[in-house]
Structures are given as C-alpha cells and as structure tokens.
C-alpha cells in the first residue's frame, strides 16, 4: 500500500482538505468495515450460544492489544486497552504509590488533561511543580533544573499539542531513571506519525488515545505499563476480568454448581489488570486494531519520512510568505504538527474561519501564550493538500516577505539547516 493509494481509505478527502489529525482524525474504511462486521455479528448471534457469542466479542477486541504492543515495541502483557489518553493518565495518577508531600512535575505547554489527574490528588497532599517553556520548547535540562528531593513523578507529553514540540524522551528517560522518578508520558500527538520504541526509551507509563494519529475515533486507546513498574502499583479498580480465567474458561465455570462469589482468585499480573470488564467497548477495540494494522502495513519509518517531507514543504511555503513559524524547525523536535501565526489570536482565528469556509480543516490552539493556527500533516495527506493550504493562506493574508517576519523565517531556516 502506498500513500496515494491509502487516500482511498478516507472518502472525506474527496470533499475536504483535512489537515487536523491532531484534533480528531478520520477513520479509514478498514476500521469502519471491521466494526460493521462486528455489528452484523451482534445482530445475528452466529455462535451456538450466548456465552460463546460473548467470548467471541472479547476475542475480537483483544486483537488490539498485540497490535498496540507492536506499535511501540512492547510486550502484549504490558498493554491495557483503555477509553482514552485521559483514562490512561488517570490510571497512572491513581496507581503510583504517592504520599503527602510528594511532587509531580509537568510543563506549562501541556494540555489540561496532563494536569487534571494530579490536581485531583491535592487533598492527599500531592503538589504540582510547573516547568516554564523557553520559546515554545521544554528541554530536558529545564526539567532537570526543576527536579527536587520531593519530585516523584514527571508527566510529560511526547509531542506538545499547541505547537508540536517533540521532547527528547530518550534523554528524559535517562534523567528520570537516574533520579528514581516515575515517568508518565502522553503519547497521543506522536504515535501514528513518529515512531517510539519503549525498549530503547524506557518509560513507566505511556497513554495514547486512538482518535488522533491512530485514526481510530471510536473511544478506545491503550495504556502501556512497564513490566517492572507493574509490580509496584496499586490498581484503583477491580472487576472479574482482572482475574485469570479459571480452568476450562468462564463458560464452564459459570455452569459449575459449587462456585461461590468469595473464592481464591488469581489476579492477573499483566497490564490487563486495568481492564475491569465484564463488558467493554468492543467496537472501539475492533476499530483500533484495524487502524493499527493499516499503520503497520504502511510502515512507521515510511510514515515518519512522509510526514517530515510534508512538514518541510509546509514550513518552506509559509516562510516564503513571511509567516511566523511557531513550531520548532529542527527535526529532532518536530512532529506532524506545524503551527504558525499571522498575528494576534483574533487574526489566527479569523484565518482559521476563512480556511474552514474553503473546507480546509485546521485548528487554532494555544497554551501559555504559545500557539496559533495548527496544521497536521499525516500519512493520508499529500503535497497537493499542503499547496492548497498555502494558496489559501497567501490569498487571505497580506504578504510580508520583505518584513520582520521574513527575516525571522530566514533565521529559522538557517537554524533548521544547522540542526536537522
């Protein structure tokens, strides 16, 4: 499958220039067809019994676990299927053994969901320290300077939502390991666009919803928990799906007269302990598995190179128009997000509305005064999409190629050549 061919999986591209995977992405046909097959099964119950029908639902959903594990080079027993990134981060906050006086470190560029689970721990005496960004970037040395003897957790996005800054996770991982600090990562703006290998970059928790760059907006994502970390956690919720299946399976178990609710159950030692059951979002897991299979078919390294080529093209085009690039230029700190600014927040919102009228989908996003018009370059996009955006921006914004923005663009371009 090539990148032009994969566009056929996304019929919305026939009507719209979709450059907003960082918000909510499009679902491919393979995912919606897999879900439709599941819905047809629920309509007709082809299994011999309702019990077998239920078991088959679990089996269909479970395919998402090995696909998610493959995405980040984890083991399947380190993966739990969760509702969203928010769900995964909340599990981390509720499971890490913290005591009054402990501190959590985040940056001021984060989406609020990175902060909210820790804010909720304030009644338990848990505090938050915030690392201020430096020109839209949060370098590991900035984080190191803010660590204290009370810091127990660093919670950080792999890619920042407002400007696409990509953290040096490998360096951050080494720092946290050296200091004995838990590392919790929000990877929702990276995975599906830029590869991440948890074997090479150890983290304790990694949460990723399916609705953005994984092209699975069906209410299911995944949570990775490093095996060594699992042994130290305090799972906040339990259900019978946390229990290892009895000999012969649950179907035979439920038909046994001697069973009682209070028995000597063996709880799973895998990340699945966070899937409480007994029913789940089957359609979401099935859609996620299908979307992940498509990503694996395309190849993550190929997707990354395609993404970088598109972002290079977009950045160069914006610079030629004298428009301020908010996103870091150097590849090692870049992702599929390109954020730019044509002036004030009102100016950027006005431009976004003009683009939406032309069926060019982008967003305006800010945090801590960092942001602007945010475009997303994904594997289903092509240079024609980027050119259409650039043409629309050029016709909507007075050209500033000879002004101060052009000079800034030139400096950014020179820095990019030195750092990419």
Give the label of every model feature segment.
Residues 1-411, 415-420:
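Pyridoxal 5′-phosphate
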């Amino acid at each position: 499958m090539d990148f032009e061919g994969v566009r056929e999986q996304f019929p919305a591209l026939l009507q719209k220039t979709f450059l907003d995977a960082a918000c909510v992405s499009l679902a491919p046909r393979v995912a919606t067809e897999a879900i439709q097959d599941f819905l047809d099964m629920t309509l007709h119950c082809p299994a011999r019994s309702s019990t077998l029908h239920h078991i088959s639902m679990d089996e269909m959903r479970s395919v998402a676990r090995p696909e998610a594990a493959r995405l980040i080079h984890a083991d399947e027993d380190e993966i739990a299927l969760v509702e969203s990134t928010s769900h995964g981060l909340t599990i981390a906050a509720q499971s890490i053994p913290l005591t009054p006086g402990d501190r959590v470190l985040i940056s001021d560029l984060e989406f609020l969901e990175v902060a909210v689970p820790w804010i909720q721990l304030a009644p338990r005496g848990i505090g938050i320290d915030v690392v201020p960004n430096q020109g839209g970037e949060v370098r590991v040395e900035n984080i190191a300077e803010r660590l204290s003897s009370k810091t127990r957790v660093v919670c950080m996005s792999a890619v920042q939502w407002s400007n696409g800054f990509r953290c040096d996770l490998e360096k951050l991982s080494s720092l946290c390991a050296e200091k004995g600090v838990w590392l919790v990562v929000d990877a929702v703006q990276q995975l599906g666009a830029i590869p991440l290998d948890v074997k090479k970059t150890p983290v304790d928790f990694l949460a990723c919803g399916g609705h953005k760059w994984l092209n699975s907006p069906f209410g299911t994502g995944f949570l990775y928990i490093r095996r060594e970390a699992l042994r130290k956690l305090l799972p906040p919720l339990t259900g019978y799906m946390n229990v290892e299946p009895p000999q012969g399976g649950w179907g035979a178990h439920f038909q046994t007269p001697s069973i009682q609710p209070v028995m000597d159950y063996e709880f799973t030692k895998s990340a699945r302990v966070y899937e409480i059951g007994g029913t789940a979002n089957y359609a979401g897991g099935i859609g996620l598995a299908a979307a992940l299979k498509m990503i694996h078919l395309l190849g993550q390294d190929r997707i990354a190179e395609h993404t970088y080529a598109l972002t290079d093209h977009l950045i160069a085009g914006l610079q030629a128009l004298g428009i301020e690039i908010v996103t870091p230029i150097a590849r090692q700190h870049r992702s599929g997000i390109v954020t730019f600014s044509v002036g004030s927040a009102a100016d950027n919102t006005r431009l976004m509305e003009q683009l939406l009228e032309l069926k060019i989908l982008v967003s305006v996003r800010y945090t801590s005064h960092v942001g602007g018009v945010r475009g997303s370059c994904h594997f289903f996009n092509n240079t024609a999409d980027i050119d259409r955006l650039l043409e629309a921006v050029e016709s909507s914004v007075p050209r500033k190629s000879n002004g101060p923005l052009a000079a800034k663009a030139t400096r950014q371009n020179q820095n990019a050549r030195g750092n990419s």
